[in-house]
Amino acid sequence: MLKVAVYWGCVIPAVQYAYEMSVREVLPKLGVEIVDLEDVSCCGNPLQSVNTFASLYLSARNMAIAEKTGLNDLLILCNGCHLSFSEAKHFLNTDEKLRQKVNSLLNDEGLQYKGSLKIWHLVDFLHDAIGKETIRKTLKNPLDGLKVASHYGCHIIRPSTLGRVDDAEDPRKMDELIEWLGAKSIDYSEKLDCCGAVLLLSHPDAALTFAGLKMKAVQGLGVDGFVDTCPSCHMMFDMRQKSVGATVGAKLDVPVIYYTQLLGVAMGIENEKLGLHLNRSPIDELLHKIA
């Protein structure tokens, strides 16, 4: 078994626990042992515009806790958390004075940031570390004939200067992950558009419009479902689908599903174990087509 430290963040265990449920079901079947981290905190992302150092420090602290396990790999499921950790690692590994300042504070907790971790997002972890052959061997119910649209989200592909999960202009890894399950990932012009979540508190109408226009475009494709991997994006498209539809004057009925839920269905895992009963969009239509 490949042992991997997993950072769940705040949103997943507090609100989007269907994501956690599905991840805990599918990873062991792929030969991955999940190591939960104790005493971790928020990644720091919400603090960036208020206190940049505090934001960076929280990411550094969480990575130091992960390093203390002795593991080499840290898996992050939230796009925003992944960007926060990646930015912190970049700055700490290139600025010795900043690193010393952070470590002097971490020392009070018996922690030290070393910069030794390989930071993964779910998408590149499954695509690059696990791979097609391993995933396909676990499938009991291939999704042949299913047509879906993918959503990468902004933070795992931008900024490209940090070395992100996939190409910022033409990402393919998530689409390939979908097609390894037997489904068809449909390309569309709005594929890289933002979900709007970052604007929800400051400019709610703009946020809902972003999500609504993208969902309206996806519905026009005639696909069977919409696949994502970020909890914040998922809340915009799944939990708030009625609201975003009303904002753009559209009645939306797009089934929205996490990739790990879709993978779990293809593995033959029971729907409830994957948290599919917690999805707010009309997921039954998608599940009926798979069955």
Where are the regions a protein language model picked out?
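Iron-sulfur cluster-binding electron-transfer modules in prokaryotic oxidoreductases
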Residues: 1-291
